[in-house]
């Protein structure tokens, strides 16, 4: 019987051979001069981890700023596209210096080739057919999302609904917030004002999506939904068209 590390190494060696055979097919998807393709690509040695992966760990911060951050989704272990977090969902990442957990709402997501010069092209194949005939495609794609910062939780567990002193550092892990965290955070609704001011986002649709998400997590608590609607009404009291648009999507 093989030991765990022996089986992992055998799997790695097999993957190395398969990848080197498949690399020659890349030119059919993203044509380049043949001299630019390596004859062989050496994959990194496997990392033998003892602990189980946290299923809420979905991405890593690759760009950060005061009001938002950009994150790249972690690659799945099988031949699948990385799973995007849903529009309007709440995620978190840490500021290691202060111990704060930064909360943010996902407002934009993309999947694109890692190579920014050569675009993907239509192949007329289903995803199952691609996994069978062109599995290297999935290693050549990246999924990224932008999240607008709406508040933070300090190291004592206190929630705040304004911008933190610092955003999360680059390369920090991004996690999905659990139900209890979102319920505690949404006891106050000042974050809705921040959402309605996010630059470069469809803020009315984003606000409505976030309200629907929280309403679902709160077991469709009608009193909370009414309070959220009233809060939006106060914020947008001078803009009836925007107010009507938001309210029409949360009923």
Question: Across the structure, where does each feature detected by a protein language model lie?
Answer:
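Short, basic/aromatic beta-hairpin or loop at an interaction surface
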Residues: 56-73
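Short beta-strand-centered aromatic/proline hotspots
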Residues: 58-61, 100-111
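Short, solvent-exposed secondary-structure boundary/capping segments
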Residues: 68-73, 112-125, 147
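A structural micro-motif recognizing beta-strand termini
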Residues: 72-80
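Short, well-ordered loop/turn sites that connect or cap secondary structure elements
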Residues: 82-86
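Charge/polar-rich, low-complexity and marginally structured segments
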Residues: 137-251
């Amino acid at each position: 019987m093989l030991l765990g590390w022996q089986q992992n190494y055998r799997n790695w060696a097999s993957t190395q051979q398969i990848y080197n055979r498949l690399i020659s097919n890349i030119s059919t998807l993203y044509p380049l001069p043949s001299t630019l393709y390596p004859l062989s690509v050496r994959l990194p040695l496997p990392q033998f981890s003892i602990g189980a992966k946290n299923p809420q760990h979905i991405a890593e911060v690759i760009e950060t700023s005061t009001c938002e951050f950009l994150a790249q989704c972690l690659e799945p272990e099988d031949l699948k596209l990385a799973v995007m977090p849903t529009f309007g969902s709440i995620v978190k990442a840490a500021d290691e210096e202060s111990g704060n957990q930064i909360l943010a709402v996902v407002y934009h997501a993309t999947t694109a080739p890692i190579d920014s010069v050569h675009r993907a092209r239509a192949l007329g194949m289903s995803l199952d057919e691609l996994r069978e005939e062109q599995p290297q495609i999935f290693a050549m794609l990246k999924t990224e999302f932008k999240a607008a910062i709406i508040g933070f939780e300090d190291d004592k567990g206190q929630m705040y609904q304004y911008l933190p002193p610092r955003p999360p550092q680059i390369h920090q892990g991004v996690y999905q917030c659990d139900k209890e965290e979102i319920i505690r955070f949404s006891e106050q609704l000042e974050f809705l004002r921040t959402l309605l001011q996010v630059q470069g986002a469809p803020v009315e649709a984003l606000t409505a999506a976030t309200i629907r998400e929280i309403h679902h997590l709160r077991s469709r608590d009608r009193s909370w939904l009414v309070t959220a609607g009233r809060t939006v009404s106060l914020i947008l009291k001078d803009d009836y068209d925007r107010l009507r648009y938001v309210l029409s999507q949360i009923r």
